[in-house]
Design a protein with these regions (language model features):
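Mid-to-C-terminal functional-domain signal that highlights helix-capping/loop sites
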Residues: 2-329
């Protein structure tokens, strides 16, 4: 399928889910005009006067800003509530093999199912008094968790509708378009707007990527990101399966990893600091029998990033540490 068709299918799916959930009633005269036209980056009204990445490489994902609605102060449920939810629902909200992003802050554990994040990408949450943002970008398979506190202020983030190297660009809700900045998920920094001019960065929060059954066993007191409404079965749709099973890319990426490097969509975990990254391949794409967890035994959070190799390479091509890889586990 050509790129345009894939984008239209994803956009249609998002629109359908949004309609069902009544997130933005179509005929509400007070509804704010959607931000962006789904084609030109400049139509999204972000300040691109000065950018820390090549401006021409910032592109639209084909949808308006926040078409994938971020979750702010989301509903959180306990294991007991999860059991009740599954009893009354038409299906299970979580099954043992589902992948979750797990965090533990001051002894408080929480799980964020990927099947939920695929429809939101950004979750602004607070765990044990610490404001965090949990991010997942399926196009790059990018996963990162950050402390939302920047320069003494707890920011909230949205989904800009723009990409850099086929990776999520978030934006902060700063009150006005002129005050907002774009933030790169895999670079953990502002790349456009006032925060970029001030060289603002995000602090990484340790996370684990694990199967739900393993996370629950390790953290029996864990809470879980709950469904937006109802029983959560709307999250069962999968629009990325074909994409995950091929080497095709849907948006511009330059540079690509050199020949003889890891496969484009080899999943990697990256730890360290700029100039001294450790890049660990995690196995064959979409091969559930070789699913690798992040963190010791998959249940102890560690600081770092998870992504497809092509996305990490492209967003860190100028960093000498990018080429240092270890053997696949």
């Amino acid at each position: 399928m050509r790129s345009g068709g894939w984008v239209l299918i994803l956009a249609a799916a998002v629109t359908l889910v949004g309609t069902v959930w009544n997130l933005a009633p179509l005929f509400d005269p007070n509804r704010v005009r959607p931000r962006g036209d789904g084609r030109e980056a400049r139509s999204y009204d972000f300040d691109l006067t000065t950018t820390l990445v090549p401006k021409e490489k910032i592109v639209s994902c084909g949808m308006v800003a926040d078409a994938l609605p971020p979750l702010d102060d989301p509903k959180v449920i306990t294991l007991a509530e999860l059991s009740g939810l599954e009893t009354v629902g038409r299906g299970k909200y979580l099954v043992p093999k589902d992948k979750v992003i797990g965090v533990v802050i001051n002894g408080v554990s929480r799980a964020y199912p990927l099947r939920v994040l695929v429809w939101h990408e950004v979750v602004n949450d607070t765990v044990s008094g610490v404001p965090i943002v949990v991010t997942y970008n399926p196009l790059s398979e990018g996963i990162a968790v950050f402390d939302r506190r920047v320069a003494g202020q707890a920011l909230t983030f949205g989904v800009s509708g723009l990409l850099y190297q086929s990776n999520l660009l978030m934006y902060d809700h700063a009150g006005s378009h002129a005050a907002e900045s774009l933030w790169s998920q895999l670079q953990a920094r502002a790349i456009a707007g006032p925060a970029a001019s001030e060289a603002r960065t995000l602090d990484v929060v340790p996370f684990a990527l694990a199967r739900w059954e393993d996370w629950q066993a390790a953290w029996p007191e864990t809470t879980i990101l709950g469904p937006v409404n109802g029983d959560g079965t709307k999250y069962g749709q999968d629009v990325y399966g074909t994409y995950f099973n091929s080497d095709d890319l849907r948006f511009p990426v330059d540079p690509l990893p050199p020949a003889g490097s890891l496969g484009r969509k080899t999943r990697v975990f990256v730890s360290g600091t700029p100039g001294a990254w450790t890049v660990t391949p995690l196995g064959v794409q979409n091969d559930e029998s070789r699913f690798e967890v992040v963190g010791p035994s998959g249940t102890t959070p560690v600081p770092g990033f998870y992504a497809f190799w092509f996305a990490w390479y492209a967003t860190h091509a100028d960093d000498p540490g990018t080429t240092e890889t270890t053997e696949s586990r």
